[in-house]
Amino acid sequence: MVSMPNPILDAAAGVTPHRRPVWFMRQAGRSLPEYREIREGVSMLDSCFRPDMLAEITLQPVRRHDVDAAILFSDIVVPLKAAGVRVEIVPGRGPVMDHPLLTRQDIENLPILDHDVHEVAEGIGIIREELNDAQTLIGFAGAPFTLASYLVEGGPSKNHEKTKSLMHQDPESWHLLMRRLVPTIVQFLRTQIDAGVQAMQLFDSWAGFLSERDYREFVLPYSMEILAQVGDVPRIHFGVGTGELLTAMSEAGSEVVGVDWRVPLDVAAQRMVSPKVLQGNLDPAILFAGEDVMRREIARICAEADRAIAAGHATGHIFNLGHGVLPNTDPDAITRAVEIIHTF
């Protein structure tokens, strides 16, 4: 039997796919009524450790929207929880640590994940059984800076002042923290790859709060180390608000660089150190603006990507949002956006 072409994997390899591939960050989530139903009475972290549930949630948007990839349903703090860190996800707030890292001793005592997360591996097996050859399963992990910020701040932060203070005031402790996070993140990604994910995204939610200088000194070496250890699948590197960091991020070693909605894709491509596959970058709010606006913005983004490819500044394009699907997005608007994207 001849296998079907896989648009995501083709694009990630710099091969022109048979249709423009698309998936959306947070496509599995609160925008879907079937997600809200299955999550009823189950905490976020519990749902990430139930193989049947995480598989079902991962597959829901693929069935509904005809996106070209499933993104593993998980959370960036799952590897911390699996390692033994006491963390919970508080509704309306996000990940909250029982004991933020306050001292050098706290950092030295931070547990390191040294085993497979078997619940996640089992869920991946279930997902792969349902996906066809044309559909890609993408795994992901939080990047070390973002995890470090949660650990140091104790939860989400508007300014990351404790994190930046540690970086500059005690760089030795900062680098120790990053060195302790790298093996945990790599182990979590290796669990996913060994279980069958076909690509992965390193997601740096908070990197946009850093200057390029700080990013290069305190973050980039560790993201590079992680990406170097998972090179057996295509790698996507994405951060929010990282337009000024794109040059540095493109040095980290991924084939694909995600771009948020603030920077046109053809401009972003020229900031890369070498041609990359671009991922992005529709503003998630445009999904609220009606079909005519969606079509216009999708056409613009596809044209920007195509210009970058034609100029030799990029090697491909995977359509995505510039961040995650917003919780109150109409799922029918997402389905229609996918249909429109597949016409370009």
From Swiss-Prot:
PROSITE patterns: UROD_1 (PS00906), UROD_2 (PS00907). Disulfide bonds: none annotated. Its EC number is 4.1.1.37. One of its GO terms (molecular function) is uroporphyrinogen decarboxylase activity. Substrate binds at R26, Q27, A28, G29, R30, D75, Y150, S205, H323. It is found in: Cytoplasm. Homodimer. Catalyzes the decarboxylation of four acetate groups of uroporphyrinogen-III to yield coproporphyrinogen-III. Belongs to the uroporphyrinogen decarboxylase family. PANTHER family: METHYLTETRAHYDROFOLATE:HOMOCYSTEINE METHYLTRANSFERASE RELATED (PTHR21091), UROPORPHYRINOGEN DECARBOXYLASE (PTHR21091:SF169). NCBIfam families: hemE. This is Uroporphyrinogen decarboxylase. It comes from Corynebacterium diphtheriae (strain ATCC 700971 / NCTC 13129 / Biotype gravis). The lineage of its organism: Bacteria, Bacillati, Actinomycetota, Actinomycetes, Mycobacteriales.
